[in-house]
């Protein structure tokens, strides 16, 4: 009783498991075959993609025509006899050629397959088959057009190449060459005058560069001479056009701040810092041309005398006072005898102290 039960259980469990394992093994073998076939197709696809003469060209628009037109063209070419050939193919029966055309039509048609093939892969395979057919047709045509075997000794390489179809353009044929402007011209006819013309062109270019550099240097020197680099705090534009001698002196030395005071007919700037009231007491003969260094010393003496008399008068120490003409002192443009900030500050501090 127990034996029959164990046998029944074993059969009930073992038979379905065994059948399932067998089915799984069959599916696995089929899947492996499919994988191998797909790997082979992928390798062919990669070879077709990386073939530069098959895809990167301008002559492969013919294979994109319809398969019916392709078959009609092939049949018309086979039906027309070749009068130039000396072989027996030109006198063949039309039925044999129709059979050949049918054999050629079969690879171009769609093949029924029980496996699913993607559209892009079918298109690539069709293009590859058409390219192969084109190569075979061209090879057959070149063989037919060759002279007979008796005259094969007179056949040259050029005559055989004349019947070969037009080669496909590769990637390197599509590259645009770029030629530099300088250097010899490759498209010109070689002559003895080219060297002399190149030498003349080089000499003219060197002379032109030298002239432009010299003119730029002259402009730089002229602009530097027109600048007044000696003025410490310029209140107006450069006055080198008023007196050329003073501008040259200011260009070569720092003492232009001294000579700028002696400029003739110098206009007073209204927007400059107001000068002290003691400057208005200077003699009018200071600006005359006939006075030299003696006049300067006399003006200094008179200035010192006036300042001694008016000690209580605030005097602005800046470059525009004749008393401190030998020194350069920084100034406050907003401080004068009317707005004495330092004195006001001092008075304010004194007012804060306790009385």
From Swiss-Prot:
GO terms of biological process kind: fungal-type cell wall organization
Superkingdom of the organism of origin: Eukaryota
UniProt biased composition (Basic and acidic residues): 92-108, 286-304
Compartment list: Cell membrane; Bud membrane
General function of this protein: Plays a role in cell wall integrity. Affects the cell wall polymer composition in the growing region of the cell.
Entry's family note: Belongs to the SKG1 family.
Record's protein name: Suppressor of lethality of KEX2 GAS1 double null mutant protein 1
């Amino acid at each position: 009783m127990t034996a029959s039960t164990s046998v029944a259980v074993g059969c009930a469990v073992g038979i379905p498991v065994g059948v399932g394992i067998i089915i799984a093994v069959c599916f696995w073998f089929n899947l492996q075959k499919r994988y191998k076939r797909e790997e082979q197709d992928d390798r062919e696809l990669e070879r077709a993609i990386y073939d530069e003469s098959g895809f990167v060209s301008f002559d492969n628009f013919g294979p994109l025509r319809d398969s019916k037109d392709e078959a009609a063209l092939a049949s018309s070419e086979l039906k027309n006899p070749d009068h130039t050939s000396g072989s027996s193919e030109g006198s063949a029966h039309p039925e044999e050629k129709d059979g050949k055309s049918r054999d050629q039509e079969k690879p171009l048609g769609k093949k029924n397959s029980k496996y699913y093939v993607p559209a892009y892969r079918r298109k690539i395979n069709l293009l590859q088959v058409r390219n192969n057919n084109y190569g075979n047709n061209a090879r057959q045509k070149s063989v037919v057009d060759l002279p007979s075997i008796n005259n094969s000794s007179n056949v040259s390489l050029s005559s055989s190449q004349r019947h070969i179809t037009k080669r496909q353009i590769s990637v390197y044929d599509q590259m645009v060459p770029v030629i530099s402007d300088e250097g010899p011209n490759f498209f010109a006819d070689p002559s003895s005058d080219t060297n002399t013309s190149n030498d003349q062109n080089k000499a003219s270019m060197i002379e032109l560069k030298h002239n432009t550099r010299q003119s730029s240097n002259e402009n730089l020197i002229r602009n530097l001479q027109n600048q007044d680099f000696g003025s410490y705090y310029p209140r107006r534009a450069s006055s080198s056009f008023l007196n050329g001698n003073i501008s040259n002196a200011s260009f070569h030395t720092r003492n232009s701040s001294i000579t700028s005071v002696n400029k003739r007919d110098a206009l007073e700037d209204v927007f400059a810092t107001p000068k002290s009231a003691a400057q208005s007491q200077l003699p009018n003969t200071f600006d005359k041309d006939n006075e030299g260094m003696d006049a300067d010393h006399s003006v200094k003496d008179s200035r010192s005398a006036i300042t001694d008399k008016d000690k209580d008068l605030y005097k602005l120490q800046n470059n525009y006072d004749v008393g401190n003409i030998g020194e350069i002192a920084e100034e406050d443009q907003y401080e004068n005898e009317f707005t004495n900030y330092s004195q006001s500050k001092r008075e304010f501090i004194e007012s804060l102290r306790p009385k």
